[in-house]
């Protein structure tokens, strides 16, 4: 029995000396493996008498249980030591302030577009949509823009393959909408019946070769169109003044219409506004182009300009957003600086 006690002690010492799981497995094999000390003792039982075999077998089993217990204890000690080391390496100071999870928000241009759509929606205007890569017909010809017009120059317009262009305004969406509207009511028109009015706005991205603090090669525009049988300049003024007051949430402003020229309207006017208070008080600010729809544009919609007339306007959404939020540099909207954009949540 004393020999087995020494064997158990040797095994326990070997396990304690092991510093890695691999070394511990080697020590285990030395005592419990196929060629280990205890396994060799078990094999020797076959040559012993029956009575002695029983007593010696009990001693070996007792020694084996003690060795296995020592092995289990060493494994647990090594696991505890490894866990303690990991905890020390990954320790956290729970007194430190937590990190706030960032939250997203609508871009200020998106906010402005949604506001514009809501205001005109309350006036009965539909919202049109259309492609940003346009044909020459819808972008220029249908809008009475002649082939020699400066707007067709490569200095002002982005051309793509196939003679198409990145739309320079959102008016093409109005023409597409009007053509679909007229086709849908062609039977009534042919019968001499009045057609339901075309009342639509077209917000979206547009592209021109321009870039500075107040201009971008990509910018957002909203254009409005109202075509019917008795639409006048008075209606244009009423609608736009109502819109601008609702957009800026104030009646403390003035609006003026200045004579101008656009190939798709006749007569045409620039629309300026002036705040009655605030940092921009007393300054006339250009916010839109407008006018009565040119008769040729009415024809291109499929309507008789002798019976139908309308007005149109086009405003820069980025410009309106700059004025609403007090932003002096247009490029701030598109730099992706979260310090700037987070102000609009």
Swiss-Prot record:
Binds 2 magnesium ions per tetramer. Its main location: cytoplasm. It catalyses: tRNA(Phe) + L-phenylalanine + ATP = L-phenylalanyl-tRNA(Phe) + AMP + diphosphate + H(+). HAMAP family: Phe_tRNA_synth_alpha1. PANTHER family: PHENYLALANINE--TRNA LIGASE, MITOCHONDRIAL, PHENYLALANYL-TRNA SYNTHETASE. GO terms for biological process: phenylalanyl-tRNA aminoacylation. Belongs to the class-II aminoacyl-tRNA synthetase family. Phe-tRNA synthetase alpha subunit type 1 subfamily. It comes from Methylibium petroleiphilum (strain ATCC BAA-1232 / LMG 22953 / PM1). CDD domains: PheRS_alpha_core. The keyword Transmembrane does not apply. Keywords: Aminoacyl-tRNA synthetase, ATP-binding, Cytoplasm, Ligase, Magnesium, Metal-binding, Nucleotide-binding, Protein biosynthesis. Mg(2+) binds at residue 266. It is an enzyme of class 6 (ligase). This is Phenylalanine--tRNA ligase alpha subunit.
């Amino acid at each position: 029995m004393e020999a087995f006690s020494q064997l158990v002690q040797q095994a326990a010492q070997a396990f304690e000396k092991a510093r890695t799981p691999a070394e511990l497995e080697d020590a285990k094999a030395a005592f419990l493996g196929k060629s280990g000390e205890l396994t060799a003792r078990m094999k020797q039982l076959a040559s012993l008498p029956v009575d002695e075999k029983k007593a010696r077998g009990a001693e070996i089993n007792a020694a084996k249980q003690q060795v296995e217990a020592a092995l289990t204890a060493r494994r647990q000690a090594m696991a505890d030591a490894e866990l303690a080391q990991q905890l020390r390496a990954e320790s956290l100071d729970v007194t430190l302030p937590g990190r706030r999870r960032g939250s997203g928000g609508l871009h200020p241009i998106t906010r402005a577009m949604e506001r514009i759509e809501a205001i005109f929606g309350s006036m009965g205007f539909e919202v049109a949509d259309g492609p940003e890569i346009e044909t020459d017909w819808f972008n220029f010809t249908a809008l009475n823009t002649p082939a020699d017009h400066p707007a067709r120059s490569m200095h002002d317009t982005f051309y793509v393959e196939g003679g198409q262009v990145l739309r320079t305004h959102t008016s093409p969406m109005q023409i597409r909408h009007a053509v679909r509207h007229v086709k849908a009511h062609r039977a009534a028109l042919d019968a001499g019946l009045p057609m339901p009015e075309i009342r639509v706005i077209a917000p979206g991205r547009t592209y021109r070769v321009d870039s500075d603090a107040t201009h971008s090669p990509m910018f957002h525009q909203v254009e409005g169109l109202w075509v019917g049988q008795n639409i006048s300049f008075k209606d244009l003024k009423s609608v736009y003044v109502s819109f601008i007051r609702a957009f800026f949430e104030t009646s403390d402003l003035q609006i003026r219409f200045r004579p101008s020229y656009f190939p798709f309207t006749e007569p045409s006017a620039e629309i300026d506004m002036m705040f009655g208070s605030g940092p921009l008080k007393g300054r006339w600010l250009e916010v839109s182009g407008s006018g009565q729809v040119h008769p040729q544009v009415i024809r291109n919609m499929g309507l008789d300009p002798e019976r139908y007339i309308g007005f149109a306007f086009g405003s820069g959404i980025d410009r309106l957003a700059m004025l609403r939020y007090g932003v002096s540099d247009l490029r701030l909207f598109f730099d992706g600086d979260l310090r700037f954009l987070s102000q609009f949540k």
